[in-house]
């Protein structure tokens, strides 16, 4: 339910076995590994892979409650070699890293792989987390409940992936086929630089949904493939880039605009800690609105000051109708990491229509 209403996804034993093999093969996981999973469902991969796994002392329904000390206790307790955490969990670990003991830091030095997923992971956050695990490879897999993993990318590969529009999630796994269904077009293609919905096929892709027959029909076109609802493109090196959700594409008079690449540009500005780019107005003539959370956020939402507006507009390089500052950006309940752009779009539309500017 991180990108919409919760829904049951059906898997066969064969598909779960294929998922186990895909994860183990991609990350070289053996029976000598030990997993700390700061996201409760991911802890189930431990028994599936035949390795010990624990969940740190945290509120599993609120990943952002994970502290560095709690993670350190878990890693030290089982001698973990693998760590998985959502971006929100990692961010709080970095924020509270001053509470780590020397024993925690020694235990962190034995971790060989740190994985973070559930939403786009900012490179600066991954770098900060990697410094806590000096011997570990930091990587972020891309996928969804219906097919995980689809692709994977390491931190050095992220650093090398510049100049694209969106988040580079790496090359698809060997067992995964990826195609792009062009926006406003038909069919699907693996040609580079075509923007559209990402569709995938893999031995570990879902069988279907639980009693959601229309959803299953829509998500199974073409037959044998899963339509992810994500928008992106493949580059000339075969790497997959994700630009946002299909329902969050902004349909301007100049053509469709995907939000993630623009959000990254805004988040690169000094004093900006988070950003969301949404569309307001009828499809085909939608206007771009940018919502910013600063490093020193206001107590109440407001229109941004002229200086910040100018900096945001220069970074976005598209016409921007308004720039708002907020205290917090609404996020999903599952990972605490995915910005609720639909909610922000409705909030921004009401504010621009003369409504009271309250916190979203």
Model segments located where?
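Conserved AMP-binding/adenylate-forming
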Residues: 112-114, 121, 127-141, 145-239, ...
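Adenylate-forming
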Residues: 57-60, 78-128, 139-147, 209-210
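Conserved AMP-binding/adenylation subdomain of ANL enzymes
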Residues: 17-34, 40-82, 96
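Short acidic/polar active-site loop segments enriched in Thr and Asp
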Residues: 30-33, 51, 81, 112, ...
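Conserved AMP-binding A3 loop
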Residues: 1-18, 52
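AMP-binding/adenylate-forming catalytic core of the ANL superfamily
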Residues: 73-76, 83, 196, 202, ...
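Alpha-helix/helix-capping structural signal
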Residues: 14, 40, 88-91, 119-120, ...
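Conserved C-terminal "lid"/linker of ANL adenylate-forming enzymes
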Residues: 250, 276-279, 289-290, 309-360
């Amino acid at each position: 339910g991180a990108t919409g209403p919760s829904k049951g996804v059906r898997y066969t034993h064969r598909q779960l076995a294929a998922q186990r093999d895909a994860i183990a093969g991609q990350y070289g996981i053996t029976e000598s590994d030990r997993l700390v999973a700061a996201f409760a469902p991911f802890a189930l991969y431990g028994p599936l892979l035949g390795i010990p796994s624990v969940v740190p002392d945290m509120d599993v329904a609120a990943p952002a409650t994970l502290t560095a000390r709690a993670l350190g206790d878990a890693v030290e307790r089982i001698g973990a070699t693998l760590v998985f955490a959502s971006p929100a969990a990692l961010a709080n670990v970095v924020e509270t890293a001053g509470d780590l003991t020397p024993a925690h830091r020694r235990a962190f030095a034995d971790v060989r792989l740190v994985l973070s997923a559930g939403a786009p992971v900012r490179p600066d956050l991954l770098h900060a987390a990697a410094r806590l695990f000096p011997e570990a490879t930091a990587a972020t897999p891309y996928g969804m409940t219906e097919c995980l993993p689809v692709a994977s990318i390491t931190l050095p590969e992220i650093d090398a992936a510049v100049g694209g529009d969106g988040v580079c999630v790496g090359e698809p796994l060997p067992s995964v086929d990826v195609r792009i269904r062009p926006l406003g077009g038909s069919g699907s293609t693996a040609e580079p630089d075509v923007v559209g919905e990402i569709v995938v096929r893999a031995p570990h892709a879902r069988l279907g949904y639980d009693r959601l027959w229309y959803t299953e029909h829509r998500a199974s076109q073409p037959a044998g493939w899963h339509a992810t609802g994500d928008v992106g493109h493949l580059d000339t090196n075969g790497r997959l880039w994700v630009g946002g959700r299909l329902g969050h594409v902004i349909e301007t008079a100049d053509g469709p605009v995907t939000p993630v690449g623009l959000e990254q540009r805004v988040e690169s500005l000094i004093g900006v800690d988070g950003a969301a780019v949404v569309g307001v107005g009828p499809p085909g003539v939608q206007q771009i609105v940018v919502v910013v959370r600063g490093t020193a956020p206001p107590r109440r939402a407001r229109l941004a000051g002229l200086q910040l507006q100018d900096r945001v507009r220069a970074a976005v390089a598209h016409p921007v109708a308004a720039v708002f500052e907020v205290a917090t950006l609404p996020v999903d309940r599952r990972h605490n990491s995915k910005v609720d752009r639909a909610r922000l779009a409705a909030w921004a539309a009401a504010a621009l229509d003369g409504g009271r500017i309250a916190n979203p």
